[in-house]
From Swiss-Prot:
Main location: cytoplasm
Protein name as it appears in the record: Transaldolase 2
General function of this protein: Transaldolase is important for the balance of metabolites in the pentose-phosphate pathway.
Listed GO biological process terms: carbohydrate metabolic process; pentose-phosphate shunt
Keyword Transferase among record annotations: yes
EC numbers on record: 2.2.1.2
Domain of life: Bacteria
One Pfam family of this chain: TAL_FSA
Length: 372
């Protein structure tokens, strides 16, 4: 066991857990991770909830109660997931208070079937914020074309947001612009900007997985030399964009009004390829005012053998551009890759949501009271 997680925190990287389940809450495991592993936040998504509810037995009593009330399957899912998020938020509340609202956050995602519907996404975000009813909740909105204006509207209402499924630098700049526009709306409405927070979830390993697959298909030595570089390069250039946007006059005017910067959050940080070190997306993306949300396996690997070498983003931008250029020169189109990943990301979450509907419906039927 190393002190890597402690050192990571000291470098300004907030450690969040990319997982949540009823068992993790009731067993005391989440509280233990907060106390012992420097975890200061939690992210969830439809895939996480689908796995938790379909595999765990910690939900039987609540599902039985919901079945007795004859609620719809959609109502049941909302009741179950918001209960978990509410309980996790309560456990993290001391962290939230100690960090003035920056950390101690729990994220819950809007229905992924609404990813291409701005109006419905805004309505869903408002409903989720009301249902969870905790100040340390972040509502996750996907960075689709329809999601961008939804971000502005929801931030403008004073609701804190985790923008998810960001793969491209262009889309990330749109996300930051949407956040600033939302803050400007909130300011016009007289809202307290210091209470509004946001993170932008920039996905890392999926970029390498897709590009490496195309590199392997080429099979040349030049192609192989580019393996495992695009994901980090993309994320590092995202941090460069973050530094640029949050030093503009537009931002400084909001800063004077006590607004908070939208922190970059490194998502999809579990290493998929065994050829790479299992802590690569933690060790190589260390910079101030960032978040790294980790699956438990990555968290444990970092605690066990992580090597934190200080800031590993500063001074990398020129090399990062060269790494992405090398991929383009191989005939692998960056724009095609990131567009595909966004579409697949939405599709995966939607598939998980549909699986969640089916498994929850089956549980409602199994635990329904007998007639008579």
């Amino acid at each position: 066991m190393t002190d890597a997680l402690k050192r990571l925190s000291k470098e300004g990287v907030a450690i969040w857990l990319d997982d949540l389940s009823r068992k993790r809450i009731t067993s005391g495991n989440l509280a233990e991770l907060i106390d012992q592993q420097h975890v200061v936040g939690v992210t969830t998504n439809p895939s996480i909830f689908q796995k938790a509810i379909s595999q765990g037995d910690g939900y039987d009593q609540q599902v039985s109660d919901l079945a007795a009330r004859r609620v719809t399957v959609e109502e049941a899912i909302r009741m179950i997931t918001t209960a978990d998020v509410r309980d996790a938020a309560d456990i993290l509340r001391p962290v939230f208070d100690a960090t003035d609202g920056q950390d101690g956050r729990v994220s819950i995602e809007v229905d992924p079937r609404l990813a291409h519907n701005t109006k419905a996404t805004v309505a869903e975000a408002k409903q989720l914020a009301w249902l969870v009813d905790r100040p340390n909740t972040l509502i996750k909105i996907p960075a689709t074309k329809a999601g961008i204006p939804a971000i502005t509207e929801v931030i403008g209402l004073g609701i804190s947001v985790n923008v998810t499924l960001i793969f491209s630098l262009e889309r990330y700049r749109m996300v930051m612009d949407a956040y600033l526009a939302g803050l400007e709306k909130a300011k016009e409405r007289g809202l307290d900007l210091s209470k509004i927070h946001s993170v932008a979830s920039f996905f890392v390993s999926r970029v390498d997985t897709e590009i490496d697959k195309r590199i392997d298909a080429l099979g040349t030595p030049e192609a192989k030399a580019a393996r495992g570089k695009a994901g980090l390069a993309n994320a590092r250039l995202a941090y460069e964009a973050y530094e640029a946007v949050f030093s503009t006059d537009r931002w400084l005017a909001l800063d004077k009004a006590q607004a908070n910067k939208q922190r970059p959050l490194w998502a999809s940080t579990g290493v998929k390829d065994p050829a790479y070190k299992d802590t690569m997306y933690v060790e190589e993306l260390v910079a101030p005012n960032t978040v790294n949300t980790m699956p438990e396996a990555t968290l444990e690997a970092t605690a066990d053998h992580g090597e934190i070498r200080g800031n590993t983003i500063a001074g990398t931008y020129e090399q990062a551009r060269a790494d992405l250029d090398a991929v383009e020169k191989l005939g692998i189109a960056y724009d095609d890759v990131v567009q595909l990943l966004e579409e697949e990301g939405v599709d995966k979450f939607e598939a998980s949501w549909n699986d969640l509907l089916k498994s929850t419906e089956a549980e409602l039927q199994r635990l329904a009271p007998s007639e008579g």
